[in-house]
Amino acid sequence: SKDYMVKDTYDLILANPPFKGTLNKENISESLSAITSTTKTELLFVALFIRLLRVGGRCACIVPDGVLFGSSKAHKNLRKELVENQYLEGVISMPSGVFKPYAGVSTAILIFTKTNAGGTEKVWFYDMKADGHSLDDKRQPIEENDIPDIIERFHHKDNEETRERTEQSFLVDKQEIADNDYDLSINKYKKIEYIPVEYPPTEEILAEIEQLNEQIAKETKELREMLAK
């Protein structure tokens, strides 16, 4: 709100704000509107975190994935702020079931440092597949868990330089992100590896179909004879 004017206060912010909502425009602080002019709370929260941090302070916040690729001017301005004016370190894409049974939306973690002077050269992307729990409403423990791997790779980002875009994590140059309207969705940059599939000749497939039809006809005839007795 306009009454809450705290700024440049915190060294670290870890947040999971409400995913979606709106505020009346007259109730929004001008300092937030200066970052991105919007009434959407998922964007305003990120702007608020930027304002609350001291220079050098860091933030890891969860956002709905629409924040990463939304095409509105407000979405683009917020992403541009993170990439151009702050130091955006990483984007961790999470599967849609991680917040079930409460919410089924796809989300991501934005990791950034407040600099007010830029600093982003490359952004680290990670495609999380599993978090140690099933992705249904029960959220039961399972063996698959990417979190230890995320921590390991994040703390050794120098090793990410040689990773291919087909892998689970990789780095993307700032300029490439800027050229794509500051899109921060991993699917924008990830390369899909297609494995060629070889099929048998058409004549061979037709021969198999004919053989199956003959077998079906034979067994159907036998079944009818059994029923007729």
Predicted segments, located by residue:
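A conserved structural/catalytic subdomain of Rossmann-like adenosyl-cofactor enzymes
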Residues: 3-229
